[in-house]
């Protein structure tokens, strides 16, 4: 058991109906924690909350309270945090997607910067012990190839990246100015069950999986040599709980920490992994699943992304349990079992 999870605390999870947030809510309830969930359903799904309730006992489910609330509503969020009096906030709410931010930068700023400051200030006023918040590997921008280290940043390549970097700065300022303990987690390409495959801003793995399962064509932006550090949701849940529970003396406090696997997979390798595991589960030949089409690289995309997770290991005790292949195998089994 992670240190600090043996005693019951109150946790506020923003973005609770989202992909990552719903997994955090589920794990906290399974651990017997009291959880307050917040979401405005701009990208989160009610179905995810239903899945959470179905995964825990009625007794554990009674520890969960949910509020439909927009983090951009300063007064509403302040009142909710004041009423809930959480010990810890796990802040996952955001408008994700680089392409979305390029098309609509103001909405990204309002959710990812203004909304986050609202959470920080509400936490400060109530005396929340710690805020763990989601940042992104996109903040590394054009730093170049090689493993990304927390203190070496390039120029931001999208409004989304800018919003996440601004959030990191505000969190650190709230720490220095008000003593609010914060830990930022720079996620590297998280994937897993409950990730929405639909819409123009869907992440690559759920989008490809949904298409390949129906033997529909897929597309790679670029020549397939671009690479990412894909990180399974189980690893990300572990990182959040560790960040919320490490002692105040940890070097992670008031810092940002890379959360990935420390290994890269090219987009073409990812295609092959998905095709192989889908073929195994549905009982078809790999060559019955169409090869991807190659399309021009999208604006704001970086060619390669790899996390140096040394600091996460040292400061949090983070140890990813699922490799990309293990995560893909588990994800494919889960998603295709739903349609069997």
Name the predicted role of every residue range.
Residues 69, 73, 197-201, 263, ...:
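Residue-level signature of the cytosolic catalytic core of signaling kinases
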Residues 152, 156-163, 187, 197, ...:
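The catalytic Tyr-centered alpha-helix of NAD(P)H-dependent dehydrogenases
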Residues 192-194:
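Short beta-strand->alpha-helix junction loop in the catalytic core
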Residues 146-155, 203, 293-296, 309:
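Short glycine/proline- and charge-enriched loop/turn segments
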Residues 10, 212-340:
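C-terminal substrate-binding subdomain of Rossmann-fold SDR/epimerase-dehydratase oxidoreductases
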Residues 166, 170, 174, 204, ...:
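Hydrophobic alpha-helix immediately C-terminal to the catalytic Tyr-X-X-X-Lys motif of short-chain
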Residues 1-190, 244, 335, 340:
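N-terminal Rossmann-like NAD(P)+-binding domain of SDR-like oxidoreductases, especially those catalyzing
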